[in-house]
A protein has these predicted regions:
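Surface-exposed binding/hinge segments that line
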Residues: 143, 160-162, 167-242
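Long beta-strand-rich cores associated with HINT superfamily self-processing modules
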Residues: 44, 576-602
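Gly/Pro-rich hinge or "lid" segments in bacterial periplasmic/extracellular proteins
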Residues: 113-117, 193-195, 204-206, 216-218, ...
Length: 602
């Protein structure tokens, strides 16, 4: 997925480069020059390296572990920049909507944070556990819990889940994730819709050999290929349960029947939303959500500067306020970092996104690996870090896999952490060996203030190594339309990508599978390496998550050391702040922001 709200659609990344990250003017000089010594980054990375486990029935039993000092009651004010475009689970794929969904929707599985809010386990949410695989991971069986109901009091049964998944094949759903649909159909892209083009709305159903509900409590998925990541995928908000009885098709997107601890009392698009308790939610069935707060009053159109100013002021209703997604803006970030009182009310962590400089392997001049290695060693990453706010907004990336991904291991084959300004001497030697000193490089960059800044700095570093760099701007609104073309004219250009769930299976295949090369796809460097392609097929068949994570890390190392089609630049981070009257404020590594489920009013 991409940084702007989490959409996979490639065009959305351009919004981050245009300023959506917001942290663009502070940090004391960026990589190599900031006062930040990286200790907090190392702590965050260490906590996020832990392998996410798949929980059993005991781990999936509610209620959620209590938060120390928490009490029930009160109202929390929530300042959001953007209104919610989608409330139908099937259409939810952006981070702000996912945060909301964690309060109002439930699925078969979900992420349970430990008492500190740091480690996570995939547990059964509406199901009794994280799933039972059979047939080598091609079949997964889920049993529903007792006492689970929608907000209207209707019991949740397997028929609702059949309806939930079948409607995803129809044109009612156009914006959400498509992993499970594609797996069930065993078809790439939008071809999955052919399996059930009208969804369940004209009386047709998926065959029992694909999706079976033999009784009211059992849901069975049948895949043609092993799907060891299914518990991860089902934990996405986009696969939360939809009421078969209450489905209003397109209208459901504005007024869904909820299943979480809250229901929507009122929603005025672009203005406000009020959440109140769902009296039919049973905490004994829920191992994930504490739901201490009685009411959430959400208002929209709060730019980062506005929400930061209000929360820093900590007066009136601001004392019991926060934002699920808004970050501390650039102007106030240094203030929050410098003031002990403000710092105590802030949380921070990595987001799932990794920046990378792509080397276009379709270009004849770039087929020489010595030239590619020269680019990799020469490229300075410090201009990119500085452009997006310095060390508080970005950490130097040594690898292609984010610290938020389960099983992450540190990597830095090009020595960027030791030499963020690049190593032009080593690069020039490689260029001399290749006989390519003075070689022209066409550098396509996004035409934003940040793009201007980092491309200038990076170009200077490449020139020191002996490249003739020609910078060419690309309009921000069409940036990813342009660079995702197979025959684009650029030798190097920057992109960013984040895992859809904490597994590198949502990083390596979409970005580096040579069989995915086509206009609009995300294999931006157009790498088509037989070993990588074979490894992708092999690892996708591994059902042991820890073993798969180890193997994905090996592919990461191979790509960087033997293929050299990309150069990692930065791991994205963010800082958020809450009013002093709010307790239970923790940074959730999966949501990539404050966890709404643990909050309470002091």
């Amino acid at each position: 997925m991409t940084p702007q709200g989490g959409r996979r659609a490639y065009a959305a990344i351009a919004a981050v480069a245009a300023g959506a990250l917001a942290l663009t003017a502070c940090g004391g000089g960026g990589a190599g020059g900031d006062k930040n010594d990286g200790r907090k980054d190392r702590e965050n990375a260490q906590r996020q390296q832990a392998q996410i486990r798949f929980g059993d029935e005991a781990a999936s039993t509610g209620p959620a572990a209590p938060v120390a000092g928490a009490k029930t009651g009160g109202t929390v004010s929530v300042f959001q920049r953007d209104s919610y475009a989608h409330l139908d689970p099937g259409n939810i794929y952006v981070s702000d909507e996912q945060a909301l969904a964690s309060l109002i929707h439930r699925g078969l599985t979900g992420y349970k944070a430990d008492a500190t809010g740091k480690g996570h386990t995939i547990v059964g949410d509406l199901a009794t556990d994280s799933g039972t695989p059979s047939d080598g991971g091609r079949t997964w069986t889920y049993t529903l819990k007792d006492g689970i109901r929608f907000a209207d009091g209707t019991p949740i049964t397997s028929k609702d889940f059949r309806h939930t998944f079948e409607r995803l094949f129809s044109q009612v759903i156009t914006e959400g994730p498509t992993f499970v649909q594609q797996w069930l159909a065993d078809k790439p892209g939008a071809e999955y819709r052919k399996l059930l083009p009208d969804g369940p709305y004209k009386g047709a159903h998926l065959p029992a050999t694909v999706l079976d509900t033999p009784d009211d409590k059992t849901v069975v998925f049948h895949f043609k290929q092993p799907k060891g990541d299914l518990p991860y995928a089902l934990a996405m908000s986009g696969y939360s349960v939809v009421s078969a009885k209450g489905d209003t098709r397109k209208a459901y997107d504005k007024a869904p029947v909820t299943s979480g601890p809250y229901r929507i009392k009122e929603f005025k698009a672009d203005k406000s939303m009020t959440l109140v308790r769902n009296e039919n939610w049973d905490p004994k069935t829920d191992p994930i959500r504490n739901a201490y707060v009685d009411r959430f009053d959400i208002t929209f159109n709060h730019q980062y500067e506005d929400s930061s100013r209000r929360l820093i002021a900590d007066t009136g209703e601001n004392r019991t306020a926060l934002s699920f997604n808004n970050q501390v803006d650039a102007t106030n970030l240094a203030k929050v970092r410098a003031d002990a009182g403000l710092r105590a009310r802030s949380v921070d962590g990595f987001q799932p996104y990794v920046g990378q400089m792509n080397i276009n392997l379709r270009k004849p001049e770039l087929k020489d690996i010595k030239v590619r290695k020269a680019i990799a060693y020469a490229l300075p990453v410090s201009p990119f870090i500085r452009a997006y706010g310095g060390d508080d907004a970005m950490a130097i990336a040594g690898g292609l896999i984010s610290p938020t991904v389960s099983g992450y291991r540190e990597s830095d084959p090009f020595g960027k952490k030791a030499k963020p300004a690049g190593d032009p001497e080593k690069a020039r030697k490689l260029l001399e060996e290749a006989g390519k000193v003075g070689m022209k490089l066409t550098f396509g960059y996004i035409n934003t203030p940040e793009g201007q800044q980092y491309s200038n700095g990076m170009a200077e570093g490449l020139k020191k190594a002996g490249f003739d760099v020609q910078r060419q701007e690309i309009p921000k609104d069409t940036y990813y339309d342009v660079v995702s073309k197979v025959n684009n004219r650029y030798d190097i250009f920057h992109t960013a990508w984040g895992a859809d769930w904490p597994s590198a299976s949502t990083v390596i295949p979409p970005l580096y599978d040579g069989r995915q090369i086509q206009d609009g796809a995300q294999n931006y460097s157009q790498v088509n390496d037989p070993r990588v392609n074979a490894d992708i097929d092999r690892i996708n068949g591994i059902t042991d998550a820890a073993k798969a994570a180890t193997e994905w890390n090996k592919v990461n190392e191979y790509l960087l050391s033997e293929v050299v089609n990309v150069v990692p630049t930065g791991y994205y981070k963010q800082v958020q702040i809450a009013g002093s009257g709010i307790g239970g404020v923790v940074y959730d590594d999966v949501l990539g922001g404050i966890d709404p489920r643990k909050l309470f009013v002091k």
